[in-house]
């Protein structure tokens, strides 16, 4: 037996966790989603009762593409912020759309139709390198900040990276 909790810390997290713990549901393993991974609020309202509980969230593969993204993000925020959950994935989605628009045209149908090609089959590239290849009319294979990006015939990712996290202390 286990409890899978799909929560958001500032809206549903604390009331649900507190109510469940008041009913004695602390001896059952809990598994959380990405919505509470970085939530100090949920940790505070649980008063330590979440110790050892686990969750799953989008992850990233360490790579040159990720380091490039982190450097760009740091520069854009004047070094004041680290990247956050979903940031690499959102960046990758935007880059695929931008690259497809450059290579195929700027109307919605052209962008959508070119995203699969942008994710594979050409010269592997990161960020601005891909833009240069697209502008030159060359085939390219966008290497994502979140990890390898390969879309299937429906435009769905064929793989992804996930982190399993465990709540420890006040982390």
Predicted stretch roles:
Residues 1-171:
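Extracytosolic ligand-binding ectodomains
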